[in-house]
Amino acid sequence: MYALIKTGGKQYKVAAGEKIKVEQIAADVGQEIVIDQVLAVGSGADLKVGTPLVAGATVKATVVAHGRHDKVRIFKMRRRKHYQKRQGHRQNFTELEISTVNG
């Protein structure tokens, strides 16, 4: 059984036992969270699509770790004007382990 969930402004396809990295969630490591924004639930050929959410569907996950992604480097330049700007960014993430998909 799999589900399409929405968290942090993004959508993820998840199944029980998978680990995913999502936008940072304010939860402690080891804490179990319940995601109720489930857009679709499927099992084999059977698929339930919500309008926009599937009623009563939930996904339970455990927070495994918090961390930061690799640095993304931004470089802006205007040719012939000697304008160069360098910038970097590291996005925070939360790693979740999906325990159950209900729906």
UniProtKB/Swiss-Prot annotation:
SUPFAM superfamilies: L21p-like (SSF141091). GO terms for molecular function: rRNA binding; structural constituent of ribosome. The keyword Membrane does not apply. One of its GO terms (cellular component) is ribonucleoprotein complex. GO terms for biological process: translation. Keywords: Ribonucleoprotein, Ribosomal protein, RNA-binding, rRNA-binding. Part of the 50S ribosomal subunit. Contacts protein L20. HAMAP family: Ribosomal_bL21. This protein binds to 23S rRNA in the presence of protein L20. Belongs to the bacterial ribosomal protein bL21 family. This is Large ribosomal subunit protein bL21. The lineage of its organism: Bacteria, Pseudomonadati, Pseudomonadota, Betaproteobacteria, Burkholderiales.
